[in-house]
UniProtKB/Swiss-Prot annotation:
GO terms for molecular function: oxidoreductase activity, acting on the CH-OH group of donors, NAD or NADP as acceptor. Its EC number is 1.1.1.-. Signal peptide: none annotated. This is Putative short-chain dehydrogenase/reductase family 42E member 2. Residues 1-32 are annotated as: Disordered. The lineage of its organism: Eukaryota, Metazoa, Chordata, Craniata, Vertebrata. It comes from Homo sapiens. Pfam families: 3Beta_HSD.
């Protein structure tokens, strides 16, 4: 993808992409207050983005199915609605200057196996958001995508927007990545659509990796829960496998800059563009998670397990979850796509975002986010080595028994082709 040159420094997301107001001899006219809407505004990223914009003087609407767990500021309005509800979107988008489409479903855990829900929200919801943006004459749309539109299990080292294509849709092992890739493309294809009565819809997409930061509610608590249950006593994958992460503060910065870069004041530099966004560093997941193990009072994983075993286990867990879903909830410890994410290097450059958006990520430490997290949890003492080994042995025997039963009753194939690639 090619982009328009020159850009300027960071400003607040206030330029509305409209013709500048004419000055008069009388007292100056005050600029109209910017009005933005954030879908998925009840989630961690959506709420953080909305809060930042509200502090800068922007009128903010947060739209989500669930109310945020954090307190709303006076400058923020919350609308409880679903992105699949066209009438609700049409009412909410009235007078909006910019839409940040953050809402999605199926990122991790058992959610990744809810195919119908994932499809209807990630693809169907995005189609409706684009359609209502046009009908309501919203000039700017920023879509929060994911690095998974390009990563599907094959190594990527310092990939960029031009050299790394979309991963083939039919080769994704999870529906979340597939539907996010479709929504990513739909958003970019919508760029340049004419608006009723004049004007043009300008769109761009941001592709972040996993998010961390204070009060993050998905990745850190889930891993911490597994650690406390002694489910993470092994490690897998190449010790050299690396990935990116992004602090919520940096991702919010990128969204604000992207919205600004879709205005006439910035020459529409981001129009029709995609950007990888991360902290500018690559890490090995197990090394990066070391502060979490330490702060919780548990030993780091020390048993190396073949990735093929873990991948097969994940496949069995997925099958068991689907088979038992009508009876009980049995969320998988890991899914196949998560195993690939941990075991296979996939890192991306942020040079394009730096050059075109003026993106300049601040430095953060995962250990600081861990420190805030453990302050609200009870530190558990380390167990003795003998007791730990006994627990591990019992769990291993139980797992092997369940694996044998699952393979027998579910008729699961060995997944040779997929396993050999890991």
């Amino acid at each position: 993808m090619k982009s328009n040159p020159p850009r300027s420094s960071l400003e607040a997301c206030k330029a509305a992409g409209q013709a500048p107001q004419q000055k008069t001899q009388a007292k100056p006219t005050k600029a109209a207050r910017q009005k933005v809407l954030v879908t998925g505004g009840g989630g961690y990223l959506g709420f953080s983005l909305g809060s930042h914009l509200a502090k800068s003087g922007t009128s903010v609407i947060l739209l989500d199915r669930r109310r945020p767990q954090w307190e709303l500021s006076p400058e923020t309005k919350f609308i409880q609605a679903d992105v699949r509800d066209e009438e609700a979107l049409y009412r909410a988008f009235e007078g909006v200057d910019c839409v940040f489409h953050v809402a999605s479903y199926g990122m991790s855990g058992a959610e990744k196996l809810q195919k119908e829900q994932i499809e209807s929200i990630n693809v169907g919801g995005t189609k409706l958001v684009i359609d209502v943006c046009v009908r309501r004459r919203v000039p700017r749309l920023i879509y929060t995508s994911t690095v998974n539109v390009a990563f599907g299990g094959k190594p990527i080292e310092q990939g960029d927007e031009d050299s790394v294509p979309y991963f083939p849709l039919d080769e994704h092992v999870d529906h979340y990545s597939r539907t996010k890739a479709i929504a990513d493309q739909l958003t970019l294809m919508a760029n340049g659509m004419p608006l009723p009565g004049g004007g043009t819809l300008r769109t761009c997409v941001l592709r972040p990796p996993g998010i961390y930061g204070p009060e993050e509610q998905r990745h850190l608590p889930r891993v911490a829960g597994h650690i406390k249950k002694r489910l993470f006593m092994f490690r897998f994958g190449d010790h050299k496998a690396r990935m990116n992460w992004v602090h919520v503060h940096n991702l919010v910065q990128a969204h604000v800059l992207a919205a600004e870069a879709l205005t006439t004041a910035k020459g529409y530099v981001a129009s029709g563009q995609a950007y990888y966004i991360n902290d500018g560093e690559s890490v090995n997941l197990f090394e990066w998670m070391a502060p979490l193990f330490e702060k919780l009072g548990y030993s780091q994983p020390w048993i190396q397990v073949p990735t093929s075993w873990v991948y097969l286990t994940a496949a069995v867990m997925e099958r068991l979850h689907l088979a038992l879903r009508p009876i009980c909830s049995l969320p998988p410890l890991l899914t196949r796509s998560e195993v690939r994410s941990v075991a296979v290097t996939h890192t991306f450059q942020i040079a394009k975002a730096r050059a075109q958006l003026g993106y300049a990520p601040d430095k953060f430490r995962f250990a600081d986010a861990v420190e805030l997290y453990v302050q609200s949890t009870t530190r558990r003492p380390r167990g003795s080595t003998a007791r730990t080994l006994l627990r591990l042995l019992l769990r291993l025997l139980l797992f092997l028994g369940l694996l044998a039963l699952a393979l027998h009753f579910l008729g699961l194939q060995p997944l040779h082709a997929a396993v050999e690639r890991l």
